[in-house]
């Protein structure tokens, strides 16, 4: 079952299509401004969610696609600024998301337990919420944009295949245990992130140097 929503639709309300197991694809019109909480939660056969290129949607609200376990790829529209908590929680087949340059906040657990294989975060992103990418076990390398001021705890914790996280600046706040001990933080020597690695006994690799320091 494929649903093309009316071109005049502005809002999809809370749980509007939740637990609709026959839904395979949905097309969102440019007029859509609000994608409500848990709107498509537990649509376990949803394969595609397509936004119009000129979509006015600015926020993917809490749990909007929670447990859409067959959703594989997503292109978010240009005006999206916030991805709400658990928006894509347990989307186990979600391999790739293309983020817009307008994105400012990824809230808590937004992509927890997803199948993401790569992560290209946009410059302009300000905040990464708690456990935002917790147990995304297919991620290997991540670069944090220099615009990010807040990295909450456990952002990449439990990502067992994650090899490196590169942080080339000093965010205003970095919470505890953003990565596993098996992961290497790439940072500048003498930076706050260097001291953070000391505090949590994390491996680090200095940018511009060849050696890895193990504490």
Question: Language-model segments: what does each one mean?
Answer:
Residues 18, 66, 89, 134, ...:
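A structural signal for leucine-rich repeat
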Residues 202:
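Short glycine/serine/threonine/alanine-rich loop segments
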Residues 13-16, 36-39, 61-64, 84-87, ...:
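Consensus positions within tandem repeat domains that build extended binding/scaffold surfaces
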Residues 1-11, 21-34, 44-59, 69-82, ...:
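Structural signature of tandem-repeat unit edges
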């Amino acid at each position: 079952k494929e649903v093309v929503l009316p071109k005049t639709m502005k809002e999809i309300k809370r749980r509007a299509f939740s637990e609709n197991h026959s839904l395979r694809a949905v097309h969102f019109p440019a007029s859509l401004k609000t994608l409500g909480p848990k709107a498509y939660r537990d649509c376990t056969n949803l394969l595609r969610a397509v936004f119009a290129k000129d979509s006015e949607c600015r926020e993917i609200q809490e749990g909007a696609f929670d447990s859409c376990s067959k959703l594989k790829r997503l292109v978010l529209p240009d005006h999206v600024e916030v991805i709400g908590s658990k928006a894509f929680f347990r989307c186990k087949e979600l391999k790739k998301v293309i983020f817009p340059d307008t994105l400012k906040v990824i809230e808590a657990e937004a992509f927890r337990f997803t199948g993401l294989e790569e992560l290209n975060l946009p410059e302009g992103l300000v905040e990464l919420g708690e456990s935002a990418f917790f147990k995304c076990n297919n991620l290997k390398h991540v670069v944090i944009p220099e615009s990010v001021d807040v990295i909450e705890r456990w952002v990449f914790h439990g990502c067992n295949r994650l090899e490196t996280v590169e942080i080339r600046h000093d965010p205003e706040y970095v919470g505890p245990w953003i990565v596993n001990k098996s992961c290497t933080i790439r940072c500048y020597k003498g930076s706050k992130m260097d001291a953070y690695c000391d505090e949590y006994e994390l491996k680090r690799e200095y940018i511009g140097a060849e050696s890895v320091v193990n504490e």
